[in-house]
Amino acid sequence: MSESSIRVVCFDLGGVVVRICRSWEEACARAGVPIREPSKFALQQFAQQRHSLVDLYQTGRLECDAYWRAIAQATGGLYSPDEVERVHSAWTMEDYPGVADLIADLNRREGVLTACLSNTNPRHWAILRGDRSPREPGSPAIAGLRRTLVSHELGLAKPDAAIYAAAERALDARPPEILFFDDLEENTRAAAQRGWRTVTIDHQRDTAAQMRSHLRTHGVLD
């Protein structure tokens, strides 16, 4: 392996490892739930409520059933809790092509630890891990990661500086030893402020190819 100071390659999940819906409307279409009154749904009072609920949910402070009910209320009654659950469960999709192979290649590199640091929640995490049903095997790429750090278990979320500090402790790595891929600039910027090596990924392009290129630049891959 080429000389590199990188000891940990850390991935965000949605938009980097796994395709996800990028809007409520897209998830509704996947779930077979009608889109109702977009102008009412988008009202600021409801949008702010939903944002606060997502923060509680993804940091482990709100159970799934309570989240469905609360989000349904924060749509102004446009959607039922059952419909919210269906839309939410449709949000995650398949791995980006080539990412599982990339992680497998990294796992063969001596001295390199693969990990994720993701804002997620119990339902999405169960789907991604294949814990819900034998018919839903989960993400092969995520199954290949040596360490998984997720917001609802940590009680913290990106871009809070505290989650990056918690990751450093969990991974037993200094900031410059971590190379972090995320599709949101606010998250890579916060990690960079702690001294992490960071790359913002374009989720609309080949994510595996982007990451391979940067891993070669950093001397992690030949």
Model-derived regions: residue spans:
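Generic structural signal for small/hydrophobic residues in well-ordered secondary structure
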Residues: 12-15, 60, 106, 116, ...
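Structured, non-catalytic alpha/beta "coupling" segments that mediate domain-domain communication
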Residues: 111-117, 121-122
